[in-house]
UniProtKB/Swiss-Prot annotation:
Xref: PROSITE patterns: ANK_REP_REGION, ANK_REPEAT
Name of the molecule in the record: Ankyrin repeat, SAM and basic leucine zipper domain-containing protein 1
Family annotation (Pfam families): Ank (PF00023), Ank_2 (PF12796), SAM_2 (PF07647)
PANTHER family given in the database record: ANKYRIN REPEAT, SAM AND BASIC LEUCINE ZIPPER DOMAIN-CONTAINING PROTEIN 1
Designated gene of the protein: ASZ1
Length: 475
């Protein structure tokens, strides 16, 4: 891997240098001598040994050669310094040694900084993080851009290094800087499908509404690259954690980031992004996200919103256009409530059979809607926790609510059974009551039968006349 890294310096945008393949770095067995190097080897031979020592990562030999007079900022093929090479292979130990010897952490070659080289290195995130931290500690600028105007945080976001992104922001990296194509770090993360990076950047204040040069937002970039979870996440207009860490000091932010990321790795939790409440989801589905702040300021819950009267809508500053959307949704959801508790005792006793039947039919319809809703949730609920787009609270909270639901359903079943038994009892008593007066519709049954028979007779007689007339015409 070291050899491939040295074949040519990384060019911003993924290209490779068109210069000679002879980069001056060779890999092979290093014939180390036991003699003291200082003053005994020609300078060119020292440089050659220095290159080989860098290539194989021999830290002790590098230190020995530096002691012999090799400049820590000497340049090789393509103008790279030893520090830039060490950063390109994420060799944190070499980076530390070179920095301690006075290497320039702010060195650039063709708009390629050492920090960018470290952020785009091929290696483990742990080693890359150490290199970046060392460079930042020596005042490397986290906002220096390459030829394509890409900054270190964009490279880190593109390659999926969450902790590196957080560390750069803690040291002053601009989250919403755009490159020559209008891509931000968030856009790069969405393009590459790095959900963890997307969540972290949102938490650090990334603006998901910024568009690329061709007018695409990060959510659209994610959708185009078939990253549907990220598309769903970025499609929400609300971002309750946006900029949550921006008000902290650098030291507090670093501590917060490293502690949080460590805990996440242990617990396999991939973000601290808070799930949306039922009110936000309901408003988002109707395209009424702009009402969220208004309703929250007035402490209006979803249930309160669904039971509001027209005068209450107006009183709370909800426009007629928005009212129509909410009322249409209410009609579709069938959330009408029958409140017998508001009726007087006399009214309860005088309720008609039609009204009572209507109540039972509506109650049954409501139960049908509830069953359908629960079945839809069961169908859509991911069986794999890794597929959940937004972070959820503890599963214990959900199971406890489900247990309460089961108890309520059992209570409802018990009450309905009692109601059924009561109705059956009333029906039996009525059938056995000799004083029961037959209802008018029952009395009129014979009349209706007579009318039906009369109508059939008339129709038959008319049909007979028609046959006779037809026969007469033929004759």
């Amino acid at each position: 891997m070291a050899a491939s890294a040295l074949r040519g310096p990384p060019v911003a945008g993924g290209g490779e240098s068109s210069e000679s393949e002879d980069d001056g770095w060779e890999i092979g067995y290093l014939d180390r001598t036991s003699q003291k190097l200082k003053g005994l080897l020609p300078i060119e031979e020292k440089k050659e040994k220095f290159k080989k020592a860098m290539t194989i990562g021999d830290v002790s030999l590098v230190q020995e050669l530096l002691d012999s007079g090799i400049s820590v900022d000497s340049t090789f093929q393509y103008g790279w310094t030893p520090l830039m090479y060490a950063a390109s292979v994420a060799n944190a130990e070499l980076v530390r040694v070179l920095l301690d010897r006075g290497a320039n952490a702010s060195f650039e070659k063709d708009k390629q900084s050492i920090l960018i080289t470290a952020c785009s290195a091929h290696g483990s995130e742990e080693q890359i993080l150490k290199c970046v931290e060392l460079l930042l500690s020596r005042n490397a600028d986290p906002n220096v851009a390459c030829r394509r105007l890409m900054t270190p945080i964009m490279y880190a976001a593109r390659d999926g290094h969450t902790q590196v992104v957080a560390l750069l922001v803690a040291h002053g990296a601009e989250v919403n800087t755009q490159d020559e194509n209008g891509y931000t770090a968030l856009t790069w993360a969405a393009r590459q499908g790095h959900k963890n990076i997307v969540l972290k950047l949102l938490e650090l204040g990334a603006n998901k509404m910024l568009q690329t040069k061709d007018g695409k937002m990060p959510s659209e970039i994610a959708k185009r690259n078939k990253h549907h979870e990220i598309f769903n996440l970025l499609s929400f207009t609300l971002n309750p954690l946006e900029g949550r860490l921006q008000q902290l000091t650098k030291e507090d932010t670093i501590c917060k980031i490293l502690t949080t990321d460590s805990d996440r790795e242990k617990d396999h939790i991939f973000s601290s992004y808070t799930a949306f409440g039922d009110l936000e989801v309901f408003l988002h589905g109707l395209g009424l996200e702009h009402m969220t702040d208004l309703l929250k300021e007035r402490d209006i819950t979803l249930r309160h919103l669904l039971t509001m009267r027209e005068d209450e809508f107006t009183k709370n500053g909800i426009t007629s256009k928005d009212q129509q959307k909410i009322l249409a949704a209410l009609k579709e959801l069938q959330v009408e409530e029958i409140q017998f508790g508001e009726l007087s005792e006399e009214t309860k006793l005088e309720i008609s059979g039609d009204e009572f039947l209507n109540f039972l039919l509506k109650l049954n319809k409501q139960c049908g809607h509830l069953i359908t809703a629960v079945q839809n949730v069961i169908t859509e609920l991911p069986v794999n926790s890794q597929k959940i787009t937004l972070e959820w609270a503890s599963p214990q909270n959900f199971t406890s609510v489900c247990e309460e639901l089961v108890n309520n359903v059992e209570d409802l079943s018990e009450k309905v059974c009692k109601l059924k038994d009561l109705i059956q009892k009333l029906q039996n008593e009525r059938e056995n009551d000799p004083t029961h007066i037959q209802l008018r519709e029952e009395v009129s049954t014979w009349n209706s039968r007579i009318l039906k028979r009369t109508a059939i007779t008339i129709c038959g007689f008319g049909f007979l006349l028609f046959i006779c007339k037809l026969t007469f015409q033929r004759k």
